[in-house]
């Protein structure tokens, strides 16, 4: 699985066990990602922070 880094032009191959790509952003600014990368379990979103997870190459 390949996931985009914070700068979308770059991507990285996820290590074994981390089989989801994720994008994290502030609820107040949904168009501006704060973090991107590989993760094993999708974190829960909160009132301030939203996570979007997916499992295909560069889907974040």
Swiss-Prot record:
Expressed by the venom gland. Coiled coil: none annotated. Disulfide bonds join 3-21, 14-38, 42-53, 54-59. Keywords: Cardiotoxin, Cytolysis, Disulfide bond, Membrane, Secreted, Target cell membrane, Target membrane, Toxin. The keyword Ion transport does not apply. The keyword Cell cycle does not apply. It is found in: Secreted; Target cell membrane. InterPro entries: Cytotoxin_Cobra (IPR003572), Snake_3FTx (IPR003571), Snake_toxin-like_sf (IPR045860), Snake_toxin_con_site (IPR018354), Toxin_cobra-type (IPR054131). One of its GO terms (biological process) is killing of cells of another organism. GO terms for molecular function: toxin activity. GO terms for cellular component: extracellular region; membrane; other organism cell membrane. Belongs to the three-finger toxin family. Short-chain subfamily. Type IA cytotoxin sub-subfamily. Monomer in solution; Homodimer and oligomer in the presence of negatively charged lipids forming a pore with a size ranging between 20 and 30 Angstroms. Shows cytolytic activity on many different cells by forming pore in lipid membranes. In vivo, increases heart rate or kills the animal by cardiac arrest. In addition, it binds to heparin with high affinity, interacts with Kv channel-interacting protein 1 (KCNIP1) in a calcium-independent manner, and binds to integrin alpha-V/beta-3 (ITGAV/ITGB3) with moderate affinity. This is Cytotoxin SP15d.
């Amino acid at each position: 699985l390949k996931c985009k880094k914070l700068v979308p032009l770059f991507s990285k191959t996820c290590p074994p066990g981390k089989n989801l790509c994720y994008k994290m952003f502030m609820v107040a600014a949904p168009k501006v990602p704060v973090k991107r990368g590989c993760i094993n379990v999708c974190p829960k979103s909160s009132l301030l922070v939203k996570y979007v997870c997916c499992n295909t190459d560069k889907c974040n």
